[in-house]
Amino acid sequence: MFKTLQRAFQIKDIRKKIFYTFMMLVVIRLGSQLPTPGINASYIQDFFAQNTGEAFNLFNAFTGGSFEQMSIFALSITPYITSSIIMQLLTIAIPKLEEMQKEGEDGRKKIASITRYVTVILALIESTAMAVGFGRQGLLEEYNFVNAAIVVLTLTAGSAFLMWVGERITEKGVGNGISIVLVINIISRVPSDMTTLYEQFVKGKSIASAALAVLIILAIILALVVLVVILQGGERRIAVQYSQKMQGRRTY
């Protein structure tokens, strides 16, 4: 693995792609620390202290903690993911889109363009719901049209920017940009999650209990990794039977 990485860095083109991807990810993480203008920080802290459900934690993980901090990337790329799913379903249901998909590269570009517009629309809807619904409850420092509009535009622009970054990484960087953005968001939560596990199962325990808890946690993580690898690399071979064709005295 290390030899492969060493060879990759020796190739100028690949080195540029890796550096470009890295810089884009740095921009994403920096942007995740920038608070949205007009947001009441104390309300956010109280809200997440009272709402610790799995749905909020999962969404917060997808956003790399941006939702919990209500940063400019609070919506992350979730509108784009939803938009992509919607377009895939519509491609099956609407013949016009199905024909467009079969047009080759031009058709795929048209569908990608439509997906971008749908992403922005979904981001507008989600940010408006947050600004209006939670704004009345104290999310905004001052609940008025100007502050609500600023929050809506900021969150929508942040989501659109992440979509653009993902596409640029796909075009000029390494791998699928949207997937990389999603993965880096999830990975960024690992230190916080490890701290939470430490406080819940290790801190204040006896040495024996703490050691047992650490071993169990490591065993669970290892089992999950092995399971993912097995599922990813698993295969089921199916025998393929071809119909026979008679031509003269020969069978094909």
Which stretches of residues belong to each language-model region?
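N-terminal cationic and glycine-rich segments that engage phosphates or anionic surfaces
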Residues: 1-101, 105-252
